[in-house]
UniProtKB/Swiss-Prot annotation:
Domain J as annotated: residue spans: 99-164
Record protein name field: DnaJ protein ERDJ2
Keywords: Chaperone, Endoplasmic reticulum, Glycoprotein, Membrane, Protein transport, Transmembrane, Transmembrane helix, Transport
Gene: ERDJ2
GO cellular component: endoplasmic reticulum membrane; Sec62/Sec63 complex
Biological processes, Gene Ontology terms: post-translational protein targeting to endoplasmic reticulum membrane; SRP-dependent cotranslational protein targeting to membrane
C-alpha cells in the first residue's frame, strides 16, 4: 500500500475532480448567457418609475443582483477548488519519489568522480558540522547520504539504473483516495466514523430529498399550489361577474397561509374606513354589510383590504408588518392571476369551450392591480363609456385632472392618445394644470402604451369552405406598435414594486353564448423564440399543403420579417360546430395596460357535411356556395351586452358600421380599437 501522505493527496484529487466536473461547464454556460444579455432600456423613463427604484442600478442593487444564492455558491466552490489545487501541489512536492541523481544535482549516468564532487559540495552546505540548522541535518541524512550511498555502491547503482530503485525490483503500489485520519484510525473510533459517514453521505441527502419532495408536491410547474388551483376551479362560474373576481382571487392557498397577527387589527380597521367605498357594500344596510365583511376568514379580510389599499393608493399608511405582507401579496399576484385566467379558459363540457366572461374579468383585475387603479374607475361617467381607468394609469392624473380635460370634449382615452403632441401638451399644462415636467412624463408613458393590430383567418387546411366536424385552423398575426419604436418593453407601473412583463391573451369566442373556442397567451419579449416558433409552424403548414422547398423558404422568410417588425404568429385548432353562421369575436387583451385591448368581429359560416362523408368528394358534388363574411365594427348589443363589465352602467354603443365581403373566417382589426377590455363601447 502507498504511504498515508500519498493517500491523502489522492483523496484531495478525487474531491477536486468531483467539484470541477459540474462546476466548470456550468460556469462557462452562465458566463455565455450573461454575455448575450443586451443592455437595452425597455422600461418606462418617467419620473414616477424612476422614483420607484425598480430599475435603478445602484451599487447596492448591483451587489444584491450578483449576491444570489447560485452566484455565491459558484464563487465559494471556485475558492475551494483554488485552495485544493494549491494544497495538492504543495503536498505533491513534499511526497517526492526517491531520485538520487536529482538529489545530488546530477544528470542520470554521471561518473563516480562527479558523484563524489557533488557529494562533497552538498556536504559543505548541509553537513551538521557545517550547518547547525535541524532541517539541513534532516535533509542531509535522509536524502543526500542515501543518494550518495545508492550511487557509490555498485549493486545499488545497478539496481537503480535497471529497476529505478536502489533496492531492486519493487512491487506495485496502490493508494486509496481517503484522508489520512481515516487510515490511521483504531477500532474504537471506527464505528463512530462509519456512522458519521453514513449519516452525512446517505441519511442527510435522503432527508433533504424527502423535505424537498414533500414541499414541491404542493406546487405546480408555475409555482402555484395545487390547493389553489382546486379552489379556483371550484369557485369559477360561467356567470362570474368581474366585480366578483376579487372574491375568488383572494381565496388562493398562498394567501390563506399568510399570518394574521393581533397587532394588525387596529391598522386593518383604519384601512377598512379608508377603502370602504371600494368594497361593494350595500349602503342601505351598511351595518349588516360591515358585520358580514368582518365575519369572513381573517386571511380573506386582510388580503382584500391590502389589495384595495394598493388600488386606492393607501399603502403608504401600512405598518411595517402589513407592508411586508402587502409586498408578498403583490409578488404572488401575477402568477396567481395567470392561473386564474387559465382556469376560466379551461375547456368544459358539453362543447369543450372555456368561459369568456370570467376570463375578461380576471384580466381586467390584473390590469388594475398592475396599474394600481381602483376598480370603480371602470364605471362609465360623463359620457365616457370606458370610464376614467385608462387615464388614471398616466402619471400625475387624478379624477380632478380627468374632469378638467373632459370639459374640452375629450370623450375617450383613445381620443386623448390620438391628439397631436403640441395640442396635448397645451391641454395638460393650461387646462389640466400640469407642469412641463409632468406633461413630459405623460408623453413618455403614452409612447410606451402598445397599439395592437390583429389579422385573423380561420380555414380548413387544404379544403375550400368549412364543413361541420372539420378541424379548423386559426391563423392570427398579432402586431404591436409603440410610438417609441420598441417591441419588447416593460409596462409603466410605478406602484407595482416588482418587474412585470407584458402579456396578451388572444381569445376567439362566441360572446353571445359566453364560450371561448380558442385561447393563447402571446408575449413580445423573446424575439428569438418567436422566430423559431413561427418558422416551424409555417414550414409544417406549407409541407402539409405540398409546397415546394422554394415556396417554403419564401414563406418562412416572410414570417421571420414580420416577427422582426413586431408581429407574432398565433395558431390553434378547433372542431367546426354545427351547420350555420356563427358570430365570433377575437379579443386581444393585455394583462398590464388599461385601454389598449382590441376585439375583432367575424362571421364563420359552417356548411353541412357532404353525403359522401369525406372532404375529397365535395368537388364531385358540385360547386359549393362561396361563404361570405363581414368584417364589422358595429353594435353588438345582442351578442355581448349580457357580458359587459360589471364596473360599467348602461353604456351607449357609438361604433360606426363598416361592412365588406371577404373570405369566410377572415377578419382584420386595425390598431387603436375604441373598446375597453371587457365591455362593449
Amino acid at each position: 500500500m502507498a504511504a498515508a501522505e500519498e493517500n491523502s493527496s489522492l483523496f484531495l484529487i478525487f474531491i477536486l475532480t468531483m467539484i470541477a466536473l459540474p462546476l466548470v461547464p456550468y460556469t462557462i454556460m452562465r458566463l455565455c448567457r450573461a454575455a448575450n444579455v443586451k443592455a437595452k432600456t425597455i422600461h418606462c423613463r418617467c419620473s414616477g418609475c424612476h422614483r420607484s427604484g425598480k430599475y435603478r442600478k445602484s451599487i447596492y442593487k448591483r451587489i444584491s443582483n450578483f449576491s444570489t444564492c447560485s452566484n455565491l455558491t459558484i464563487l465559494l466552490l471556485w475558492i475551494v477548488m483554488i485552495f485544493l489545487v494549491y494544497y495538492i501541489k504543495h503536498v505533491s512536492r513534499e511526497v517526492q519519489v526517491f531520485e538520487p541523481y536529482s538529489i545530488l544535482g546530477l544528470e542520470p549516468g554521471a561518473s563516480e568522480s562527479d558523484i563524489k564532487k557533488s557529494y562533497r559540495r552538498l556536504s559543505i552546505q548541509y553537513h551538521p558540522d557545517k550547518n547547525p540548522d535541524p532541517e539541513a541535518h534532516k535533509y542531509f541524512v535522509e536524502f543526500i547520504s542515501k543518494a550518495y550511498q545508492a550511487l557509490t555502491d555498485p549493486v545499488s547503482r545497478e539496481n537503480y539504473e535497471k529497476y529505478g530503485h536502489p533496492d531492486g525490483r519493487q512491487g506495485m503500489q496502490m493508494g486509496i483516495a481517503l484522508p489520512k485520519f481515516l487510515l490511521n484510525m483504531d477500532g474504537a473510533s471506527g464505528g463512530i466514523m462509519l456512522l458519521g459517514i453514513v449519516g452525512l453521505c446517505i441519511l442527510l441527502p435522503l432527508m433533504i430529498a424527502v423535505i424537498y419532495l414533500s414541499r414541491s408536491s404542493k406546487y405546480t410547474g408555475n409555482y402555484v399550489m395545487h390547493q389553489t388551483l382546486s379552489t379556483y376551479y371550484y369557485f369559477m362560474k360561467p356567470s362570474l361577474a368581474p366585480s366578483k373576481v376579487m372574491d375568488v382571487f383572494i381565496k388562493a392557498a398562498e394567501y390563506m397561509e399568510m399570518p394574521v397577527r393581533r397587532s394588525d387589527d387596529e391598522p386593518l380597521q383604519k384601512l377598512f374606513v379608508a377603502v370602504r367605498s371600494e368594497l361593494n357594500l350595500d349602503l342601505k344596510n351598511i351595518r349588516t354589510e360591515q358585520a358580514k365583511f368582518w365575519k369572513q376568514h381573517p386571511s380573506l379580510v386582510k388580503m382584500e383590504l391590502l389589495i384595495q389599499a394598493h388600488l386606492t393608493g393607501e399603502s403608504f399608511a401600512l405598518t411595517p408588518a402589513l407592508l411586508k405582507d402587502y409586498r408578498h401579496m403583490l409578488e404572488l399576484a401575477p402568477r396567481l392571476l395567470d392561473e386564474l385566467v387559465k382556469i376560466a379558459l379551461l375547456p368544459r363540457s358539453p362543447h369543450g369551450f372555456g368561459w369568456l366572461r370570467p376570463a375578461i374579468g380576471v384580466i381586467e383585475l390584473s390590469q388594475n392591480i398592475i396599474q394600481a387603479v381602483p376598480l370603480s374607475a371602470r364605471k362609465a361617467s360623463g359620457g365616457n363609456s370606458e370610464g376614467i381607468a385608462p387615464f388614471l394609469q398616466l402619471p400625475h392624473f387624478t379624477e380632478t385632472v380627468v374632469k378638467k380635460i373632459a370639459r374640452k370634449k375629450i370623450r375617450s382615452f383613445q381620443e386623448f392618445c390620438d391628439m397631436p403632441v403640441e395640442e396635448r401638451a397645451t391641454l395638460l399644462t393650461q387646462v389640466a394644470g400640469l407642469s412641463d415636467e409632468g406633461a413630459q412624463d405623460v408623453e413618455l408613458v403614452l409612447e410606451m402604451i402598445p397599439s395592437i393590430e390583429v389579422d385573423i383567418k380561420c380555414e380548413t387546411e387544404g379544403e375550400e369552405g368549412i364543413q361541420e366536424g372539420d378541424v379548423v385552423t386559426m391563423y392570427a398575426w398579432v402586431s404591436l406598435h409603440r410610438r417609441n419604436g420598441l417591441t419588447a418593453a416593460l409596462p409603466h407601473a410605478p406602484s407595482f414594486p416588482f418587474h412585470k412583463e407584458e402579456n396578451f391573451w388572444l381569445l376567439l369566442a362566441d360572446a353571445a353564448s359566453n364560450e371561448v373556442w380558442l385561447s393563447q397567451k402571446v408575449s413580445f419579449m423573446d424575439e428569438t423564440t418567436a422566430i423559431t416558433a413561427a418558422s416551424k409552424a409555417i414550414q409544417e403548414t406549407q409541407e402539409a399543403l405540398g409546397a415546394s422547398a422554394k415556396e417554403i423558404g419564401i414563406a418562412i422568410r416572410e414570417a421571420v420579417d414580420r416577427v422582426k417588425k413586431g408581429s407574432r404568429l398565433v395558431m390553434g385548432k378547433f372542431q367546426a360546430p354545427a351547420e350555420g353562421t356563427h358570430n365570433l369575436t377575437s379579443f386581444c387583451l393585455c394583462d398590464a395596460w388599461i385601454g389598449c385591448d382590441t376585439k375583432t368581429s367575424l362571421k364563420l359560416k359552417v356548411l353541412k357535411r357532404s353525403r359522401a362523408g369525406t372532404r375529397g368528394h365535395v368537388a364531385e358534388e358540385g360547386p359549393v356556395a362561396e361563404d361570405g363574411i363581414e368584417e364589422e365594427e358595429e353594435e353588438e348589443e345582442e351578442e355581448y351586452d349580457d357580458y359587459e363589465s360589471e364596473y360599467s352602467d348602461d353604456e351607449e354603443d357609438e361604433k360606426s358600421k363598416g361592412k365588406g365581403k371577404v373570405a369566410n373566417g377572415v377578419a382584420h382589426q386595425k390598431a387603436n380599437s375604441d373598446i375597453d377590455s371587457g365591455s362593449d363601447d
